[in-house]
Amino acid sequence: MIKKIFALPVIEQISPVLSRRKLDELDLIVVDHPQVKASFALQGAHLLSWKPAGEEEVLWLSNNTPFKNGVAIRGGVPVCWPWFGPAAQQGLPAHGFARNLPWTLKSHHEDADGVALTFELTQSEETKKFWPHDFTLLAHFRVGKTCEIDLESHGEFETTSALHTYFNVGDIAKVSVSGLGDRFIDKVNDAKENVLTDGIQTFPDRTDRVYLNPQDCSVINDEALNRIIAVGHQHHLNVVGWNPGPALSISMGDMPDDGYKTFVCVETAYASETQKVTKEKPAHLAQSIRVAKR
C-alpha cells in the first residue's frame, strides 16, 4: 500500500518536497525529502507512513484498508479524539470522530533535516452531531530522522485520547516491549487490573492492555528486523499495547488474515481518566519516535 501511495500521480506540487495526491476518495500529502519519505491523509491528519533515509518503513499500513470518506484507516497513526475506545453513547464512532473527518493543512516548513506540518480541525455542523463543544484541534508533525507528533486541543471540555501508532515489525512472535510500567487494565480479560511482573510485554495472542504507570519511553525490541524503536511519550497518562492476534485479525475486513504478525501498537494515551482543557490551558498529547539497530 505504501509503494502504491508513492506511485500515485501528483495533483499539486505544494513545495519541492511536498505534493498532493489522491487515493480513491481521500486526498493525501506526500513528503519526498532526501532525509525522509512520509505520507499523510487529510482525513484524520493521519500519518500513513514514515521512512527515514536508510531505514525500513517504521509504520505499518494495512494493504486491505479502504481510502473512503468517513471510514477509519487501518494503520499509521490514527488520532483518537475526543474519546478513546467505545463511545459512552450508543451509535457514536469508536475512538471519536477526529480520525474520520477531513482536516486542513495549515502550514508547512522544510529544511535540510526534514519537514514540519500542522493540520487543523475545528467544530462544524458535522462534529456537533457527535459532540456539543466548540474546539480547535491542531496536529503538529515533524518528520526526518526522527518523528515528532504533538496533538494540541483548545476549548472548554474534557476528553480522552490516543495516538494509536501501528509499528511495522518483522515477526510479532519475536517482538518485546519494555518501559510500560507494571500495572495495567487487561481489556481482553474483563478489564481486570493486573501486573506485568518482569517488565517485558510479549504478544503470544490477542493483547489489549492500558498501562497505568508507564515510563516516558517505551522500547520495541524487534529481533526479526534487527532494530529497536524508541517511543517517547509526553503529556500522557497511559500507554496502550495492542495486537489483535490471529482470530481477531481474521475477522477484521480491513486487515489481511495474517496482518497481526507484522505490527504492534504502542499508543501514547490519556485514557484511564479524562484530560481537562480550558481556554487558559490547552491540552497536549505528544509522541516522539526514533529507530536504532539492535
Swiss-Prot record:
Monomer in solution. Gene3D superfamilies: 2.70.98.10. Signal peptide: none annotated. This is Putative glucose-6-phosphate 1-epimerase. It comes from Escherichia coli (strain K12). It catalyses: alpha-D-glucose 6-phosphate = beta-D-glucose 6-phosphate. Its EC number is 5.1.3.15. The gene is yeaD. Keywords: Isomerase. One of its GO terms (biological process) is carbohydrate metabolic process. Pfam families: Aldose_epim. The active site is at 164, 267.
